[in-house]
Amino acid sequence: MNQVDYLRISLIDRCNFRCQYCMPEGSELDYILKQQLLTDEELLTLVQEVFIPVGFRQFRLTGGEPLLRPRVVDLVGAIASLPQTQDLSMTTNGFLLAPIAQNLYDAGLRRINISLDSLDPHIFDQIIGSHGRSRWQQVWDGIQAAHRVGFDPLKLNVVVIPGVNDHEILDLAALTIDKQWHVRFIEFMPIGNGELFGDRGWVSSSQLRQQIRDRWGLTDAQVRGSGPADVFQIPGAKGTLGFISQMSECFCDRCNRMRLSADGWLRPCLLNETGQLDLKTSLRSGVSIHQLREQVRHLLAIKPEINYKGRDSGTTGAYSRTMSQIGG
């Protein structure tokens, strides 16, 4: 069994984008009230006194959009400064990144993933649900700022949506040739948006790899991180290409993570809502730290039984939360 030592922490469920695959435009979202969010103190208590003692050493900050969280730089610094923290990273849409990229780096953040689903501003704005002023340039500025500051690896996440951005695969892959950037193609996963995307299906990673192989060739490669991507490289390129194939190539048997939602629910599996723990309510009602640790230890022990091991389009309507509410 894989050691589960990686926790994805959603700092906030709100986002300044409304990406089609994450927060479908037709969906009704009930945002978490501020008083229902884990406070900074509660979050740090859980990290330091519950998660680290049971073996978690790697942490990724997500959202919603994590940069919308007040005092996010201070929170990064607090987690990064814990001696047991072996790796701290963040996934962001990049829109608010440029002005604070250096501050985040100075606080101890070293790895960052930025969503970039299109190089075409019009398509990009369509995907993110932008109405009015284009947001592409500000995201691109955030990527450039992260590059200048020295985040390494700097990963760009691309969710491949059939008929929307799948014609840009080669252009996006080419970003890795001259810069040490790492472009990761993610198979579209219909969670909480089955009605919107049910007829579109998804493009498999093997198809994407073949497109790139036919153009430049591909070799096996590696990049620092603990994610599920299969990593390749265009011969002679400075960066790498990752393929996350959660729909076509089940990787549940090598899952090493759990997810903590912004309102304190610990979720052992992205695709299975069984076994979630409401840590915030337990913490606020006076349950001892020892008891919380034991609950998490038990969840770790049964995680292999909970892991979702199928891929069936019939499950798309079975999720009570969208990607933005889960934390991706």
From Swiss-Prot:
Superkingdom, taxonomy of origin: Bacteria
Protein name per Swiss-Prot or TrEMBL: GTP 3',8-cyclase
EC numbers: 4.1.99.22
Cofactor(s) it depends on: [4Fe-4S] cluster
Chain residues that bind [4Fe-4S] cluster 2: 252, 255, 269
Organism (species): Trichormus variabilis (strain ATCC 29413 / PCC 7937)
Regions crossing the membrane: none
Assigned keywords, A-Z: 4Fe-4S, GTP-binding, Iron, Iron-sulfur, Lyase, Metal-binding, Molybdenum cofactor biosynthesis, Nucleotide-binding, S-adenosyl-L-methionine
Pathways involved: Cofactor biosynthesis; molybdopterin biosynthesis
Family note: Belongs to the radical SAM superfamily. MoaA family.
Function: Catalyzes the cyclization of GTP to (8S)-3',8-cyclo-7,8-dihydroguanosine 5'-triphosphate.
One Gene Ontology MF term: GTP binding
Record note on cofactor: Binds 2 [4Fe-4S] clusters. Binds 1 [4Fe-4S] cluster coordinated with 3 cysteines and an exchangeable S-adenosyl-L-methionine and 1 [4Fe-4S] cluster coordinated with 3 cysteines and the GTP-derived substrate.
Lineage: Bacteria, Bacillati, Cyanobacteriota, Cyanophyceae, Nostocales
Binding residue positions for GTP: 8, 60, 91, 155, 257-259
Catalyzed reactions: GTP + AH2 + S-adenosyl-L-methionine = (8S)-3',8-cyclo-7,8-dihydroguanosine 5'-triphosphate + 5'-deoxyadenosine + L-methionine + A + H(+)
Annotated positions binding S-adenosyl-L-methionine: 21, 64, 115, 189
GO BP term, pick one: Mo-molybdopterin cofactor biosynthetic process
Radical SAM core domain mapped to chain residues: 1-229
Amino acids binding [4Fe-4S] cluster 1: 15, 19, 22
HAMAP family assigned: MoaA_B
Pfam family name, one: Radical_SAM
